C-alpha cells in the first residue's frame, strides 16, 4: 500500500514555475512564424503541454495572448535600454552599450522578434499606441547620445539614423542564416555603427530621382489590375481581412469575374509575390549587363532596388507581412527566388569586400534590404510620390553604410 501510494505520488505533475514564460515564448514564436490569424489557442496549448481550457485560465482570448506577446517583446527593448536614462558615461560609450544591449535582446528573441515588426498591425487602437510609445522611447534613447556625437543632424535625420540602426539589428529575425553568436554580434554591431555614422544628405540639396517602374501595369488588362489592387488591399488591411468582394470592387468587376483568372485568394497572393520577385530579379539583372566592377554594380543595384521599392511600397512590405499565408509549396518557391536575388548581391559584396565571408555578406544584404521597408515606413514611402527623391537618397546612403561599412 505504501509502495502504491509512493508510485501515485511519483506521477503527480506539478505546474512549472515558469509556465507564464513558457506560454509567452511559445505564443510569440507561433504568431511570428504563422501569423496572427493562422494560430489557434489549441496549437499554443499543445506546444506548452497543457490543455486549451488551461490556457484560457491565463488569457481570456487569442487576442489577449497576442497583445501580451507583442507588447512583451517591445518591453524587452525598453528594459534593455533603461540604463541610458541615467547613464553618465561618454555619449559614445552609451551608444555602444545601447547597440550591444539591443543586439543581445534581438538574438535572444530571434524566433519571435518578427512579431512586433510584421504582425503588430493586428493590435487594437490603444495597444497599437502602447507599442508605438515603446518604440519611440527606444528611438529617443538612441538619439540622445547622437545629439552630442553628431550635433548637426536634424530631427528627421536622427530619426532615420535610430530607425536604421534598429532595422539593421532587427533584420536578423527575418532569416535563418547562421553564424557563431560572437561573430554575428560583431557584424551587426559594425553595421549599426556605420548606419548611425552615415552622412545623410540635406533636404535642401537637389536630388535626381532614379527612374522607377510599376511592377504591375494596370492598363494592360484585368489580370494585372487584379494583382495590383489585391496587393494594395493586402498591405492596407492584411490578407486574412481582405475579401474577394473588396478586390472585385477595387477593379470594377463582379466577384465571379475574379475566378476567370484565379482559383482563389491564396492564388492571387502567391502569383503576386512570385511574379513581383521574378520581375524585380530580371530588372536588376538587366541593369548589370556589361559591367564588371562589383562595388559599382552593387551601388547601381541599391539605386534601382530603392526606386522600385518606393514605386511599389505594397509589395516591399507584403513580402515580410503576408508570406506566412502562402501554402508551404508557394513559400518555398518564393524563398527560392528571393534566395537567388540575395545570393547575387552577396557575391558582389563579397567581391567588393574580400575580408567578408559569404555568410557575413549574406547577413549584411538581408540587413540592407530590411532598411528599405523599415525606414521607408518611417518616411511614409507609400505617400511620397513625386517627393520621394530625398528619402530615397537617405535610404540609399544607409544601405551603402550597411553594405560597405562606412558612415561617410
What are these regions (language model features)?
Residues 126-150, 159-160, 187, 329-353, ...:
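Amphipathic alpha-helical packing segments from all-alpha helical-bundle domains
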Amino acid at each position: 500500500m505504501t509502495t502504491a501510494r509512493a508510485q501515485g505520488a511519483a506521477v503527480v505533475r506539478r505546474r512549472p514555475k515558469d509556465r507564464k514564460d513558457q506560454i509567452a515564448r511559445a505564443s510569440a514564436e507561433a504568431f511570428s512564424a504563422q501569423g496572427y490569424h493562422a494560430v489557434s489557442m489549441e496549437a499554443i496549448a499543445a506546444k506548452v503541454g497543457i490543455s486549451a481550457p488551461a490556457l484560457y485560465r491565463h488569457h481570456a482570448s487569442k487576442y489577449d495572448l497576442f497583445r501580451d506577446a507583442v507588447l512583451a517583446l517591445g518591453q524587452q527593448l525598453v528594459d534593455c535600454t533603461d540604463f541610458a536614462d541615467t547613464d553618465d558615461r561618454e555619449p559614445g560609450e552609451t551608444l555602444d552599450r545601447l547597440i550591444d544591449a539591443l543586439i543581445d535582446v534581438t538574438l535572444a528573441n530571434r524566433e519571435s522578434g518578427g512579431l512586433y515588426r510584421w504582425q503588430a498591425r493586428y493590435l487594437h487602437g490603444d495597444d497599437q499606441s502602447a507599442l508605438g510609445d515603446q518604440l519611440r522611447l527606444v528611438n529617443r534613447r538612441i538619439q540622445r547620445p547622437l545629439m552630442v556625437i553628431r550635433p548637426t543632424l536634424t530631427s528627421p535625420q536622427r530619426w532615420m539614423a535610430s530607425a536604421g540602426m534598429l532595422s539593421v539589428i532587427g533584420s536578423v529575425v527575418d532569416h535563418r542564416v547562421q553564424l557563431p553568436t560572437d561573430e554575428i554580434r560583431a557584424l551587426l554591431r559594425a553595421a549599426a555603427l556605420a548606419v548611425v555614422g552615415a552622412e545623410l544628405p540635406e533636404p535642401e540639396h537637389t536630388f535626381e530621382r532614379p527612374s522607377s517602374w510599376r511592377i504591375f501595369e494596370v492598363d494592360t488588362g484585368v489580370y494585372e489590375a487584379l494583382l495590383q489592387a489585391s496587393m494594395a488591399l493586402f498591405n492596407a488591411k492584411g490578407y486574412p481581412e481582405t475579401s474577394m468582394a473588396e478586390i472585385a470592387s477595387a477593379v470594377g468587376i463582379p466577384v465571379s469575374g475574379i475566378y476567370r483568372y484565379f482559383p482563389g485568394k491564396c492564388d492571387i497572393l502567391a502569383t503576386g509575390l512570385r511574379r513581383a520577385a521574378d520581375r524585380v530579379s530580371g530588372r536588376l539583372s538587366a541593369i548589370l549587363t556589361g559591367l564588371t566592377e562589383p562595388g559599382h554594380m552593387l551601388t547601381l543595384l541599391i539605386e534601382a532596388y530603392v526606386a522600385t521599392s518606393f514605386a511599389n511600397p505594397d509589395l516591399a512590405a507584403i513580402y515580410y507581412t503576408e508570406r506566412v499565408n502562402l501554402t508551404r509549396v508557394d513559400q518555398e518557391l518564393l524563398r527560392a527566388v528571393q534566395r537567388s536575388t540575395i545570393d547575387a548581391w552577396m557575391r558582389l559584396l563579397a567581391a567588393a569586400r574580400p575580408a567578408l565571408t559569404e555568410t557575413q555578406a549574406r547577413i549584411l544584404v538581408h540587413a540592407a534590404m530590411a532598411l528599405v521597408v523599415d525606414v521607408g515606413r518611417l518616411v511614409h514611402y507609400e505617400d511620397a510620390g513625386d517627393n520621394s527623391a530625398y528619402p530615397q537618397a537617405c535610404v540609399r546612403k544607409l544601405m551603402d553604410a550597411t553594405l560597405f561599412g562606412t558612415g561617410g
